[in-house]
Regions:
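Bacterial N-terminal signal peptides that target proteins for export
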Residues: 1-9
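Bacterial N-terminal signal peptides
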Residues: 10-19
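The feature marks non-catalytic terminal segments
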Residues: 24-26, 33, 186-363
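Active-site beta-strand->loop->alpha-helix modules in alpha/beta enzyme cores, enriched
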Residues: 24-193, 214-215
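Long beta-sheet-rich domains in secretory-pathway and surface-associated proteins
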Residues: 369-620, 626
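Aromatic-Pro/Gly-enriched surface loop or interdomain linker
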Residues: 593-674, 705, 812, 830-837
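A glycine-rich, often tryptophan-bearing local segment used as a flexible ligand/cofactor-contacting loop or short
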Residues: 676-757
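Catalytic beta-strand/loop cores that center a nucleophilic Ser/Cys/Thr
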Residues: 725-817, 836-837
Length: 838
């Protein structure tokens, strides 16, 4: 038998439990929840749903499988969505991937599904699967799909996207279908990825489908007219009496967790068909895609008596006395324990134990006295256990990890009489920091680097600090594990939970995300924050060879309390001529240098997340001149362009709705609207007259990309223009200067082809395809083998001023420190201005 123990120890994080993020707050299942969980104990079916990104999943189908069919249904998202946009905040790239991971986990906590990932990195929009698989390591991503199949053992695999090129919607989408179809046949072969078989076994699914939809066929009307006799269908509109909701209502709640993508959904009720196109395997004779699949206990050798007992438990369940089911549940648990090791034994044993705990009304609470700690530090921990039933429950022992602190209690958990233990643990000096495991090693543009096979696919890093509770119930031993978390009472909210995390003793960061140097030295400030009490050392900045750094004043720190901060100033100068490199701030404690910055991701719909990133920042020596001294910036969805503009000497004022009147705007040389401003700020449309009046009187207005527009206004501009979904995804695509003498390409910086080298992820997106003759288009670009797109940058005079609309991804380029992007953006905000400021 394979090493199922460690494999499932990690795998359960994503398979048996919805998410550790959700588990931070101890579960309190209702009688209806328990009744549904008992029904599930007697169903041994598994479904794997495969797509490319967070929010690609069909929450209606996932909820239907989990709550109507009682199957174990897992969503395999090949990426974590790092390359997308963010509608609710500034997180991009890796940080966006962390946010979208948590949104997926919250969605699964609602629809009842489980979650897995591959190591594929979302590098941004891709126009075809060949490009996608060129950036992804096809063999490695394919191995992850095979691993997911072997770990989840699906009877049926359902792909969100077709593997057929004629249905291309996005290269990642089509690639996900292609990889799933290939993996279907490979997962059952022992000579394919044999290294996985140290931990799991081969598995051959029964059949595979493509979850088709009207939006692949040009609309609902066209889909209604097409011949669907070859398709399979199922009604997703079923009603769940135990939930008091229809499946569609549950699905809408789950989909609405994808807030950073703007996918809040209205709930619907009534019949609603979902359609499936057969791909391979044994084709059902009827309409049921699960036809002929044995999902009873008889599929497990020796399991039939367990199925009979589970049926008895379900029939005899009493909602006003769930504990009455516990004696039979204990018998079922013991029968499962006697089965040979295997997938369903592990799954159903864990599910049965969870139901027993819920029926007993047992509550476990393990909370630390602080939300964070550091290696070597001692932390107070409060442990609470209570049994809210009349059954005999004994708490025999506790084991706290990682301190290996065991406590023998022999405490009788009498009905509603709680057990409380206040203790402390010491975090080992070699304890790993709490951080997303897939971000621990350097990644490529298309792949994350995860060496541990058993971590691959797990949604989150396993929590380091846990408590094992060793009980006997009616004389029968049973163990549970819970993570140590942190909770606090907030007067306006009540009980607030967050993860308990092990973090470095000190964090360090530059105060800017990138630096642009001229021929003058520049002030570089770094900020230190204590992650532990009583730490001291020195701060500094490492610079590239040929650069010069000197500290201004004392560079020592002596923090008495965790949370203290101190800022240090350094003078840095770059060598002459164009050059690029990295500035690396550090805090030295003894012989160890600490090089990490801490980013906290905090929204009310996900658990708070701490991410550790390298504190290094990009620095370049470039000739960037700007004539606009005073710039007003109206933030949209969130970006870091204001800080970038300050790097080149602009005085940036952040604008709110109340500031958008023509008289107030007159003091600015230029006004910039942040990315997706019209998408995210409903009031902005009402300020258009003032903005356009500002332009008429001599101002420069730069409007960055939007994806849609408020129907209350005919245009984003003083003149008509029509947005599209056209984009250039190749960041190295040739840029043609259509109007080389236009002021946007000449003053104050002469723009050449060299200014478009070193760009990141993409050139731009959502370019206009139609525009008024008042506009000129200075640039043209396109992805390989595609037609030229001239709408990336549009400039129009309006009265005495200049209006600019651009889909160029400045929001990615400026924070990345791309010199040419700085030079071009400086020209845009300087349109119509006299003089140059180096």
């Amino acid at each position: 038998m394979k090493n199922f123990h460690r494999s499932f120890l990690l795998g359960l994080l994503g398979l048996l439990f919805t998410s550790l993020a959700v588990a931070q707050k101890p579960a309190k299942p209702s009688a209806a929840d328990l009744h549904q969980a008992i029904k599930k104990l007697n169903v041994l079916g598994s479904i794997l749903y495969v797509a490319a990104h967070p929010d690609d999943e069909n929450t209606r189908f996932i909820s239907y499988c989990a709550n109507e069919k009682y199957y174990n249904v897992t969503y395999l998202s090949l990426t974590r969505g790092d390359g997308g946009q963010n509608l609710i905040g500034p997180e991009m790239r890796d940080l966006l991937g962390v946010l979208r991971t948590e949104e997926l986990l919250m969605a699964r906590s609602i629809d009842g599904g489980k979650q897995r990932f591959s190591r594929a990195n979302d590098f941004g929009f891709s126009k075809n699967p060949e490009e996608t698989l060129g950036f992804w390591d096809k063999n490695e991503v394919l191995s992850d799909v095979v691993w997911a199949i072997r770990e989840t053992r699906p009877d049926v695999i359902v792909n969100r996207f077709s593997h057929d090129r004629k249905y291309d919607t996005h290269g990642h989408h089509t690639a996900s279908g292609m990889l799933s179809v290939e993996a279907f046949d490979l997962a059952g072969k022992a000579d394919v990825y044999p290294e996985q078989l140290k931990y799991t076994e081969t598995w051959q699914p029964r059949r595979q489908f493509y979850n088709t939809s009207w939006w692949f066929f040009g609309g609902q009307e066209a889909f209604n007219k097409m011949d669907k006799s070859h398709l399979f269908s199922a009604d997703m509109g079923v009603y769940f009496p135990l939930k008091g909701k229809s499946n569609n209502e549950v699905a809408a709640e789950a989909r609405s967790m994808h807030r950073c993508q703007g996918f809040g959904s209205l709930s619907t009720r009534g019949e609603s068909l979902e359609w499936f196109d057969f791909i391979k395997g044994d084709r059902p004779q009827g309409q049921d895609i699960f036809e002929g699949i044995n999902t009873s206990w008889s599929r497990v050798k020796g399991g039939e008596p367990i199925g009979a007992l589970m049926a008895k438990i379900e029939q005899g369940f009493k909602s006003d006395n769930p504990a009455a089911s516990v004696p039979d549940l204990l018998k079922a648990m013991q029968m499962i324990q006697q089965l040979p090791d295997g997938y369903w034994k592990t799954i159903k044993l864990a599910e049965t134990k969870d139901v027993i705990r819920g029926c007993l009304g047992i509550y476990f609470d393990a909370t630390a006295s602080a939300p964070t700690t550091s290696p070597g530090q001692q932390v107070k921990v409060r442990l609470e256990a209570i049994n809210r039933s009349a059954l005999d429950v004994q708490l025999n022992a506790l084991s706290i990890r990682p301190s290996l602190k065991d406590t023998t209690t022999a405490f009788a958990l009498i009905n509603n009489k709680g057990f409380i233990l206040n203790t402390s643990i010491t975090i080992p000096e070699n304890a790993p920091y709490t951080a997303p495991y897939w971000l621990q090693k350097a990644a490529t543009i298309g792949m994350y680097n995860v060496e541990d096979q058993l971590l691959r696919g797990v949604p989150e890093t396993p929590r380091y600090a846990t408590v094992r509770w060793m009980l006997t119930v009616q004389g029968i031993p049973i163990e549970y594990e819970s993570e140590i978390a942190y909770k606090v009472g907030e007067s306006s909210i009540g009980e607030v939970w967050r993860p308990f995390e092990v973090l470095p003793p000190v964090f360090v960061e530059c105060t800017e995300s990138s630096y642009i140097f001229s021929d003058k030295e520049k002030n570089v400030s770094i900020r230190l924050k204590a992650g532990a009490d009583n730490i001291s050392g020195t701060a500094g900045v490492q610079v590239p060879a040929g650069w010069v750094v000197s500290n201004v004043g004392d560079n020592t720190f002596n923090f008495k309390k965790k949370g203290e901060e101190k800022t240090f100033l350094f003078k840095v100068s770059a060598p002459s001529g164009p050059t690029e490199g990295e500035l690396i701030p550090f805090a030295r404690i003894g012989e160890k240098e600490h090089l990490m910055r801490l980013i906290t991701i905090e929204y009310d719909h996900i658990p708070q997340q701490s991410v550790l990133q390298s504190a290094k920042v990009h620095a370049s020596r470039a000739d960037v001149r700007v004539s606009a001294r005073n710039v007003g910036y109206y933030m949209g969805a969130g970006d870091d362009i204001p800080a970038a503009l300050r790097q080149i000497g602009c005085n940036v004022t952040m604008l709110e709705d109340k500031d958008l009147d023509a008289d107030n705007l007159a003091k600015f040389d230029a006004v910039v609207l942040g990315v997706r401003a019209y998408d995210t700020k409903d009031q902005l449309v009402f300020h258009q007259p003032a903005l356009f009046e500002y332009v008429q009187k001599g101002g420069t207005l730069v409007t960055q990309y939007n994806t849609s527009f408020n129907a209350n206004s005919p245009s984003l501009a003083p003149f008509p223009l029509k947005l599209s979904r056209q984009r250039v995804t190749d960041e190295t695509a040739e840029i043609r200067l259509l109007l080389p003498e236009h002021q946007a390409l000449n003053r104050p910086n002469k723009i050449t082809s060299a200014d478009f080298s070193g760009w990141v992820q993409e050139r731009g997106l959502y370019f206009p395809t139609e525009w008024d003759q008042a506009f000129v288009a200075p640039l043209s670009m396109n992805d390989p083998n595609e037609k030229a797109l001239d709408g990336a940058l549009l400039v129009a005079p309006h009265g005495q001023g200049q209006f600019v609309y651009t889909g160029i991804s400045f929001f990615r380029q400026l924070p990345a420190g791309v010199p040419g992007a700085y030079r071009l953006f400086a020209n845009l905000i300087s349109l119509g201005k006299e003089g140059e400021k180096p």
